Amino acid sequence: MERYFTELAVAFVRGRLGRSDATLEEGFDAGLRLHKFKQNTELPRVKRVLGMLHGLAPESLLDIGSGRGTFLWPLLASFPDLPVTAIDWSERRVSDLVAVRTGGVERLSVERMDVEHLSFPPAAFDVVTMLEVLEHLSNPVEGLRRVVQTARRAVIVSVPSVPDENPEHLHLFRVEQLRDMAAEAGCSRVTLEHVLNHRIMLCQKP
């Protein structure tokens, strides 16, 4: 049987069905789409970012562009006491995230918001993660500046490192571009790694 992030999947089922005693099996019977909760911790970029976060030991975290939870579910499972705020622009994705919170994961806060309209105060979160988002932005320099401003200590960003056919990918960033953008955004220390067709950038603030 396939492995799931069971606690999170059950919370989603309870949030969707409106019952605090609902089970995973009842979710399947009700036709809820639970495949998004299959365990994927071994995705190379997810595994590496989680490793970086263990080194940082964040006190609070903002995840930008949480989507269907490819990174968010492993994050919540790996850091069971970490307060996490998840934002996404898709109403459907946000609705799914809210169901998880409503179903019992109270340390998860959810907002419908995009990078270009971040409304959090400066240094509102200890660490900010933004995976597979920067390449979608029409103005990535300004977007990264806003993200860095929202973080107290550090920002972790991942972007594709090879061309693809996704029409929503507006940019393919070189290492030098990312370093320059991070410095311009206010990062004093920038570390870049390459992990299976992706670049992962750790930006630390003074």
How does the language model describe each region?
Residues 146-150:
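Conserved helix-to-beta-strand junction in the class I
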Residues 137-138, 151-152:
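Helix-to-beta-strand junctions that scaffold the AdoMet/dcAdoMet cofactor pocket
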Residues 1-121, 127, 131, 141-144, ...:
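Conserved N-terminal segment of class I S-adenosyl-L-methionine
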Residues 161-165:
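A short, flexible beta-alpha/helix-coil linker loop
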Residues 152-160:
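Conserved beta-strand signature within the Rossmann-like core of class I S-adenosyl-L-methionine
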Residues 131-134, 158:
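Residues lining the SAM
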